[in-house]
Amino acid sequence: MHPGLLLVNLGSPASPRTKDVKAYLQEFLSDPSVIEMPAALWQPLLRGIILPTRSWRSATFYQDSWLPQGSPLIVYSQAICQQVQAALPDWNVRLAMTYGQPDIGATLKAMVADGCEKPIILPLFPQYTQSTHGGIHRQVEATGLPHTFIDSFYDQPTYIHLLATKVWQSYQAHHYDAVIFSYHSIPTAMVRHGDPYQRECEATTKAVLAERPELPADKVITAYQSKFGPMPWLKPYLKNELMQLVELGKRNVLVVTPSFVVDCLETLEEDYVQNYQTFRASGGDRFDLVPPMNKDTGFSQFLADLAIQKQEASNHAITSSSKS
């Protein structure tokens, strides 16, 4: 028997072709963790209006951001997995996706068949929210296999240090009028129902400021992006903040995206293209993004250390239980 670690990210279409994007969006947007609406109401809307109109448009965005090796989210997630495996040579480290391939259930079963007694599940999302973690939990639980979860790491000192260092390095490169910490938004109904996401996002911003007091707090803004559908989502929205900053004469901005640990459609298309164009069209000058963790070996080592800590805590709990 040997320890196992399953890293999980959101997923990506198999290709940027419209049919593959449509299949991916159908799986993603059919998850009740993502869309809190009765299926009898939501599915006709999804299949009849949203998928036919959104799939081809999203496909063009994926085509623009696709790397020669494949989806950026998959490519960078695989790189992280390989680096974590190198840091944990005695472990079985694998990668799965909530939607698309590799499948969570099949990967977890393969790990157990390979001798992993109780794999650790580590979603690659610093902050916990039902919309990302709910589907992971359901798929893992459906296997009936023993496991443990690391549900968030937004408050881990090493993670905050890594994030704060990236922000500070980028901030020093130019004179910025504002630094926006932009997190993926979620429906406000989830927060009302007890989802801790907003609290954890705000805590992340505050922790970075505490780690780097040289960063002017009066320039820092917390915002949210990637809203989908007509329901109210967490505000303020990044796009609106960008336009308002220009109106205030703040034309040089730095954007940080802590909820995305790797480049994906939201960073490469929504931010680098759409939000950049909005900002420039409004009269803004400099629009820069702090790079996500991507292939940062320090981040991969942090994930490896986090898994070791979890394994040691589990072993200690088992030992204590056997003695009592």
From Swiss-Prot:
Binding site for Fe(2+): 184, 266
EC top class named in words: lyase
Keyword Metal-binding: yes
The UniProt record lists the keyword Cytoplasm: yes
Gene Ontology MF annotations: ferrochelatase activity; metal ion binding
Superkingdom of source: Bacteria
Stated family: Belongs to the ferrochelatase family.
Role, per record: Involved in coproporphyrin-dependent heme b biosynthesis. Catalyzes the insertion of ferrous iron into coproporphyrin III to form Fe-coproporphyrin III.
Protein name per Swiss-Prot or TrEMBL: Coproporphyrin III ferrochelatase
Naturally occurring in which organism (per UniProt): Lactiplantibacillus plantarum (strain ATCC BAA-793 / NCIMB 8826 / WCFS1) (Lactobacillus plantarum)
